[in-house]
């Protein structure tokens, strides 16, 4: 499925603010949550609806609800946690499945060190969240894990994506749609996205200098 770059004015504005070298941890964290919520709006726009009747202020009224689609949000630790509250603000009933994937900074290869999946995950829509899609290794490893657990409907939401990461995911899992706020230029020799956001995990958690 094609990657979708969501070019909504609010998203473009907020991503622009996130690129500032001098952004504070507080502002970066808040913006990550806000853009995460806006991407959720796009990633769930095809969920089926069903009608039902409630008692309104003037009597019975027909309203709609999402038709029995169970959802799990899958943050890739640790940076994915920075988008989680924004996503859950729109789908508060979703279960959270945590997946820990670490990248070897020399080889840039990913390995999974933690998986805590929601019950009945094989019948759920899985929304993977991770601020950066760089080499694609962490995303591919997470999708591999979810498919092994029986997931059939998987979508990925990232703040910024590199063409190299998109290509890796599309080659390994062409059935998974990627929703991103920005497709950036390239990866540098260290596997960082250019122009990118810097190290999103460090900026969300305030663990290193802002220009890391």
Swiss-Prot record:
A GO MF term: magnesium ion binding
GO biological process: UMP salvage; uracil salvage
Broad enzyme group: transferase
EC numbers, comma separated: 2.4.2.9
Keyword match Ligase: no
Names of required cofactors: Mg(2+)
Residues annotated for uracil binding in this entry: 193, 198-200
Pathway: Pyrimidine metabolism; UMP biosynthesis via salvage pathway; UMP from uracil: step 1/1
Pfam families: UPRTase
Catalysed transformations (reactions): UMP + diphosphate = 5-phospho-alpha-D-ribose 1-diphosphate + uracil
Protein activity control: Allosterically activated by GTP.
InterPro entries hit by this protein: PRibTrfase_dom (IPR000836), PRTase-like (IPR029057), Upp_B (IPR034332), UPRTase/APRTase (IPR050054), Ura_phspho_trans (IPR005765)
Cofactor: how and how many bound: Binds 1 Mg(2+) ion per subunit. The magnesium is bound as Mg-PRPP.
Binding site for 5-phospho-alpha-D-ribose 1-diphosphate: 78, 103, 130-138, 199
Domain of life: Bacteria
Record's keyword terms, sorted: Allosteric enzyme, Glycosyltransferase, GTP-binding, Magnesium, Nucleotide-binding, Transferase
Family: Belongs to the UPRTase family.
Stored NCBIfam families: PRK00129.1, upp
Function of the molecule: Catalyzes the conversion of uracil and 5-phospho-alpha-D-ribose 1-diphosphate (PRPP) to UMP and diphosphate.
PANTHER family in alphabetical order: ADENINE PHOSPHORIBOSYLTRANSFERASE, URACIL PHOSPHORIBOSYLTRANSFERASE, CHLOROPLASTIC
Name of the protein in its database record: Uracil phosphoribosyltransferase
